[in-house]
Design a protein with these regions (language model features):
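A broadly used, surface-exposed interaction patch
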Residues: 52-125
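Short, hydrophobic, well-ordered secondary-structure elements
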Residues: 13-14, 21, 33-54, 129-132, ...
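Conserved catalytic-core segments centered on acid/base and nucleophilic motifs
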Residues: 23, 27-48, 105, 111-120, ...
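Amphipathic, non-membrane alpha-helical segments in soluble helical-bundle scaffolds
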Residues: 3-13, 33-40, 95-105, 121, ...
Length: 174
């Protein structure tokens, strides 16, 4: 049985990934890729936190000044690792494609939050699709089919018969 804190983080990960997919698939939505990336980064962070808690590890920043283990607190709560730190701790010296995908999206998220960017939708479809498929793969590997998203997500309907080259390429990847 999973610790409650791991289940709570999994619930947050599920909610964020579903909200991200909804935002991306909403017809006529502006900034769909921007919203998707921000929500997927939240989902991935919560997923990694759930993995660490499942494995008995606290994904919290430690104070460096004491001999005993002490944690950094913000607003009376331990400061959790952000996604970049989770990637370092989880993958360590390995650099699989999913890590590269997430590092790219983390850097892009910072730009989305702090600068104006041109329309990203056509160019980033493949990266967005990879982030979703990689999320589902890691979720299944770490927690099993019981926690899979495949039952809650559906393939979105399309209004057009034509498929932009980026979408066609992404569909061939998986």
């Amino acid at each position: 049985r999973l610790p409650r804190i791991a289940r709570d983080h999994l619930a947050k990960a599920h909610a964020a990934v579903i909200a991200g997919v909804e935002a991306y698939n909403k017809p006529g939505s502006r900034f769909r890729t921007d919203q998707y990336i921000v929500l997927m980064m939240m989902a991935w962070t919560a997923l990694f936190h759930a993995i660490f808690f499942k494995n008995g590890r606290r994904p919290w920043y430690r104070k460096k000044t004491t001999k005993r283990v002490r944690y950094v607190y913000v607003d009376d709560e331990p400061k959790h690792w952000e996604l970049a730190t989770c990637l370092e701790e989880y993958y360590q010296d390995k650099n699989p494609p999913e890590r590269t995908n997430l590092q790219f999206l983390v850097a892009l998220r910072h730009k989305i939050e702090h600068r104006h960017l041109p329309d990203l939708d056509p160019v980033l479809y493949g990266e967005c699709q990879a982030a979703l498929l990689n999320f589902e793969d890691l979720l299944g590997r770490e927690f099993g089919a019981r926690y899979a998203l495949t039952e809650t997500l559906a393939v979105s309907l399309q209004f057009s018969k034509s498929i932009p080259p980026q979408k066609a390429a992404a569909m061939r990847l998986h």
